[in-house]
A protein has these predicted regions:
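Phosphate/pyrophosphate-binding loops and the adjoining catalytic core of nucleotide-dependent enzymes
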Residues: 2-19
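An alpha-helical support segment within catalytic cores of ATP-dependent transferases
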Residues: 15-33, 133-185, 195, 241, ...
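Conserved N-terminal boundary motif of the eukaryotic protein kinase catalytic domain
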Residues: 32-41
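Active-site acidic catalytic loop and adjacent metal/ATP-binding pocket
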Residues: 40-61, 170-214
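Activation segment
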Residues: 66, 111, 199-200, 207-209, ...
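Hydrophobic packing residues in well-ordered alpha-helices of helical domains and bundles
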Residues: 75, 121, 161-165, 245, ...
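Active-site activation/catalytic loop segments of kinase-like enzymes and analogous catalytic loops
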Residues: 213-240, 250-269, 276-277
C-alpha cells in the first residue's frame, strides 16, 4: 500500500468512526443496545471505500474517498433514489447518511452466488422502471463533455475525432428524445447483489430519469451474448426498438470508455477500438 493509499484509508476510517459515534441516531427497526464496532475494509472502488460494521443486524459503511460525481447535488439525489428503491425492495435500506461527509450506513446485502442471468437482470430493470419519477435527468452529452475535459488534449482529441466519425451526436439525440424512465444507469456486476432469492442493486450514484436503452446497454455489457437477447426481450418485449438499442449500445460503450480513461486507465479501450465496436 502506497503512502497516498494509506492516507486515504486512514481518512475514510476516521469518517466512518464519526458515523459510528452517532449510532443512537441510526434508523433501525430495532435500535442497537450498544455501540457498533468498525469491521474490516471489504472493498475499495474508484470512488468509495466499504467497511463492515460489527452489529446486529449486519450493516456496512460506504465512505467516499475520491469524487467521481458529475454535480454537487449528486449525493443528495442518489439518497433520494436509493431510499425510493429500498422502500420497494430493490436496494439495501439506508439507516444513516451524512451528506457533508458523503457517508452512508446501510443494511448489508449478500454477494450474488452466481452471475445474474439476462432474465433476472431484465426483471430488476423492469421493477426499477416502474418506480415513480424524480426531478433530475441523465445528461449524457454534458457528462461525456465533463469526462473529455478531465483528459489532457492528446487523449481527448482522438476521442472527439472518433465521436465525430461514429456520429455519436445522432445517437445522443435519439436517446435524448426517448421516453424517460427512472434508470439506475450503472447495473454492472459489482453493483448487483442479492436479498433472499431476489436481485437488488447498490451504488445509485448515476441513477436518474433517462432512456431505458442506455440503461439496458450498460447492464448488457457484462452479459454473455446468449443472455443479452433474453434481457432485452424481458424489458421491451415486442416493443424493442432496434435503432434505439444500437444508439444505447454505442453511447454506453463511449461513456464506459471515457469513465475508464478518467478513473481506470488500464481498462480503457482506444478510440479506434470503441469505434470498431460501434460498427464503424
Amino acid at each position: 500500500m502506497g503512502l497516498s493509499d494509506m492516507a486515504r484509508t486512514m481518512a475514510t476510517a476516521d469518517v466512518l468512526r464519526r458515523c459510528l459515534d452517532r449510532w443512537q441516531d441510526w434508523q433501525l427497526a430495532t435500535p442497537l443496545d450498544s455501540p457498533p464496532k468498525m469491521g474490516a475494509l471489504i472493498a475499495q472502488g474508484s470512488g468509495h471505500s466499504v467497511y463492515g460494521i460489527a452489529s446486529t443486524p449486519q450493516l456496512i459503511g460506504r465512505i467516499r474517498h475520491q469524487s467521481t460525481r458529475l454535480t454537487d447535488e449528486a449525493f443528495s439525489q442518489e439518497l433520494i433514489i436509493w431510499s425510493l428503491a429500498a422502500q420497494n425492495g430493490l436496494a439495501p435500506r439506508i439507516v444513516y447518511a451524512d451528506e457533508k461527509e458523503q457517508a452512508v450506513i446501510c443494511e448489508r446485502a449478500d454477494t450474488a452466488a452466481q452471475a445474474a442471468s439476462g432474465e433476472a437482470l431484465g426483471t430488476l430493470c423492469r421493477r426499477i422502471y416502474a418506480l415513480p419519477g424524480v426531478s433530475h435527468q441523465l445528461t449524457l452529452a454534458s457528462d461525456i463533455e465533463h469526462y473529455l475535459k478531465r483528459l489532457p488534449a492528446h487523449l481527448a482529441d482522438p476521442w472527439r475525432a472518433a465521436m465525430h466519425a461514429g456520429n455519436a451526436e445522432t445517437a445522443l439525440a435519439a436517446l435524448a428524445a426517448d421516453t424517460l424512465y427512472l434508470c439506475h444507469n450503472d447495473l454492472t456486476p459489482g453493483n448487483l447483489m442479492s436479498h433472499g432469492d431476489q436481485l437488488i442493486a447498490i451504488d445509485w450514484e448515476y441513477a436518474a430519469m433517462g432512456s431505458r436503452y442506455f440503461d439496458v446497454a450498460i447492464a448488457c455489457e457484462a452479459l454473455p451474448d446468449s443472455e443479452r437477447g433474453i434481457m432485452m426481450r424481458q424489458v421491451f418485449g415486442d416493443a424493442l426498438d432496434d435503432e434505439l438499442m444500437t444508439a444505447g449500445k454505442q453511447i454506453a460503450g463511449l461513456v464506459t470508455a471515457l469513465w475508464q480513461c478518467c478513473f481506470a486507465i488500464d481498462e480503457a479501450p482506444s478510440p479506434a477500438e470503441w469505434l470498431g465496436s460501434s460498427g464503424y
